[in-house]
């Protein structure tokens, strides 16, 4: 399936077969693809919690205004933004770049995020949004 077909054939599913269970291999494959989602400065400032335990999914269903999808779906993925990723070893994904580039990236991260909780929050929301879109495809 190409990108255009994946986008045009995507649908919002409201009813799930509560008896269907994703295999751990399917969940692992999905998450390996999800972590390829883009993030600003390659911060990878999202964290994912996969939930398959039925009792926890029921609690999530209540928190989600009693929607059936979290309860009946095989898997719930909680997307969490890490708002301190910009300072948690930010150059770990830039190791193969020249030192000058690494220094520029670090300075840019500090300038954009050090004094702005709003920027950190907005970036975490964007990054989780990209990851969510990847999951839905």
Q: Language-model features: where?
A:
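Acidic, surface-exposed loops and disordered segments
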Residues: 1-137
């Amino acid at each position: 399936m190409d990108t255009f077909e994946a986008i045009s054939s995507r649908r919002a599913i409201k009813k799930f077969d509560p008896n269907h269970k994703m295999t751990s291999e399917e969940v692992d494959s999905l998450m390996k693809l999800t972590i390829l989602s883009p993030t600003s400065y390659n911060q990878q400032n999202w964290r994912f919690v996969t939930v398959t335990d039925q009792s926890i999914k029921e609690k999530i269903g209540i928190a989600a205004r009693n929607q059936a999808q979290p309860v009946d779906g095989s898997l719930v993925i909680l997307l969490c933004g890490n708002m301190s990723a910009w300072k948690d070893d930010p150059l770990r994904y830039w190791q193969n770049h020249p030192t000058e580039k690494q220094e520029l990236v670090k300075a840019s991260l500090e300038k954009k995020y050090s004094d702005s909780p709003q920027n950190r929050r907005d970036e975490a929301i964007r990054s989780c949004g990209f990851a969510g879109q990847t999951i839905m495809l």
